[in-house]
Amino acid sequence: GNDGISFAHAVSAPDADFTKEQLWRALASKVDVDGKLVENPYKKWSDIDASLPNKKIEILIAPPTSGTRDAWNSLVMGKGCTKTAKSLYDAAGKKAKKECAKMREDGYAVEAGENDTLIVQKLTSNPDAYGFFGYSYLVANKDKVKAASIEGVQPSLEGIQNYSYPIARPLFFYVKKAHIGVVPGIQEYLKEFTSKKSMGNRGYLAKIGLVPLASDKYKVTRTAALDLNTINIK
C-alpha cells in the first residue's frame, strides 16, 4: 500500500502552501546563504521567503527513531536540500544525504514524540505551529487540523496513490522465500494480507489508515504474492 505525510496545522489557521526547499530551510541545521553553509539563521517563515507568513517558525517533529521522520528526511529534507548545499557538503568531504537531513536544535523544531494525538492537541492550541504525521491521522482529525499544500498539492487518497502528492511513499511487505513451506502458516498469511478484503479499496486495512494501491498495482502485487515472485512497486 501507500502512505502520505501531511504537514498540518490547526483548522483555525490561514491556509498555507510550501515548497520542499522552504521546508528544508525552515528545519535544516545548516543552510546555504550567499554560497556558504551557515547555522540556520531563519526565525520567521518570511525570513525564508517574503511570500510566507510573518510568523515565528514552530514545527513539531517526529523523533529520529520514527519511520515517519525517516520518510520525511528522504522525501523533504533530501529533495528540498539545494544543489548549492549538496555541492558544499561534497566539497567538504561530507555525505550530503546525511548532512541535509540534520535538523536544527535551536528551539524552532521541537521533537514531539510519536504520539500523534499529543501533536494534534498542541497544534490545536497553537495555530502558528505545524507538525507532520501520516495522512490517515489527518483524516481522522479533520475537525481539528488541516494540511498545508506542498508545492500546490493537497494530500488526498488519489494523490498519494499516484504519487502526484509530493510527500507520498510506498509501504513494503517482505517475505523471505526460504521460509515458505518451513514456517507454518506464512504462505496463508501472505495470501490473506494481499487479499481484497484485507488491502483492497474497502479492506479492513484501509479502514485503519492504509492508502490502497491503485488497481493495476494491486493486481501485480496479488499475482506476485500467489506465485511467490519478487517485485518492485514504484
Where are these regions (language model features)?
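Flexible loop/hinge segments at secondary-structure junctions
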Residues: 1-234
